[in-house]
Amino acid sequence: MMQIERLSPDEYAKIYTPQHVFNSVDFTELNRDKAEDLHYLSIHDTKHRFGIILGERNGMLRSPFSAPFGGFTTRGVQTLERMEEAVDLLLAYAAERSLQLVVTLQPLVYDETQLSKWTSVLTRKINVRCTDLNYHVDLQRIADYEQIIDRSARKNLHHAQNVPFNLIKLNSNDLKDVTRAYEVIRRNREERGFPLRMTLEQVWQTVSNVV
């Protein structure tokens, strides 16, 4: 039988290796001021099996609390039964503190098999607010990309191919290059009326200290 335990950031980092940057201790600590409290949790029996980082804010435990997605960090392959038990323990942890729980999983492209299992478990344990459509295409499995898209998409593709442009790989360790990339995104968001939630300084701190 497993139990849930709250750890310090250092303890958590020594045990769990994140599958993506948003589940890392470094990224979490960089954004600590965006939550009222942080909960580094380990779910284990004789072995540490599941870790999750939650930000507490406005009566809710959120994973993530300041990122596109979060979810569990798993040590090795775990059974569905253990995954279900882990979610039950997490729900009990939140209920004991009179807190709601919100978990946003990463896109399936990150780990289709494991994330499909988490989706199955979570949809049976908690309410699903929304499911994002996944538009990624695995080009390694497709011989001719143009043959799987419709006529209007092919037309747009050919138009884009006829526009002269260069692809330049920028240096993420160079503030000037990061600023250049940030400005492209900022202008795009501004022209489309979408909010930009991170300042250049926040992006630079993330890139230089975490990524």
Predicted regions and their residues:
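Acyl-donor binding region in acyl/amide transferases
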Residues: 59-127
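A conserved beta-strand-loop-helix scaffold within acyl/acetyltransferase catalytic domains
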Residues: 2-60, 106-211
